[in-house]
Amino acid sequence: MTKIYTLTLAPSLDSATQTPQIYPEGKLRCSAPVFEPGGGGINVARAVTFLGGKATAIFPIGGATGEHLAALLADEQVPIETVETRDWTRQNLHVHVAASGEQYRFVMPGAALTDDEFRRLEEKVLTIDPGSLLVISGSLPPGISVENLMQLVKNAQQQGLRCIIDSSGDALAAALDVGNIELVK
């Protein structure tokens, strides 16, 4: 069976809550938050695990939010490989407004990665067995260029990994230029 790995460069700890209504400048009383792991590749690994398969999620992790994210994935029995980062893992906020049924999604930028942190993530990728599937999904964090990502993809392909890219904009166009991608979304 093909081994599946995911790479998420901008993981998140997603929190969701509900409030009766939203209005400016007042205190908005909310329900107790619900926390879930987030980020493109992490969501892929969660789905594979939920369906009875096995996918290892590779991602950077920092601070208390990163620890909480890792604990939630452990609760779901999703295997992880992480690289400690200086910056805390981002936390997003989803708010459901009961009166209107509307949902507001506040998405923070991913934690910036240093060159060394990115290099350590790439080293983890390059230890994956040839023939394995690598799903790279999610947004790019500050400090990581499309060129950095495409070089990682090329190195992974040279290692014998089959790559799937789930991205948008410049990263998606660059993935098409790299070629030999199993699937692009």
Regions found by a protein language model. Give the residues of each.
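Glycine-rich phosphate/adenosyl-contacting loop at the front of the ribokinase-like
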Residues: 1-58, 67
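Residues at the starts of beta-strands that form the adenosine-phosphate
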Residues: 3, 54-56, 79, 161-162, ...
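Cofactor-binding loop segments of dinucleotide-utilizing enzymes, especially the Rossmann-like FAD-
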Residues: 7-11, 60-63, 85, 98, ...
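Short glycine-rich anion-binding loops that position phosphate/pyrophosphate groups of nucleotides
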Residues: 10-12, 88, 109-111, 139-142
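Short, hinge-like loop/turn segments at secondary-structure boundaries
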Residues: 23-24, 74-76, 99-101, 152, ...
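Conserved N-terminal subdomain of the carbohydrate kinase-like
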Residues: 26, 50-132
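Conserved beta-alpha-beta core of the PfkB/ribokinase-like small-molecule kinase fold
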Residues: 133-185
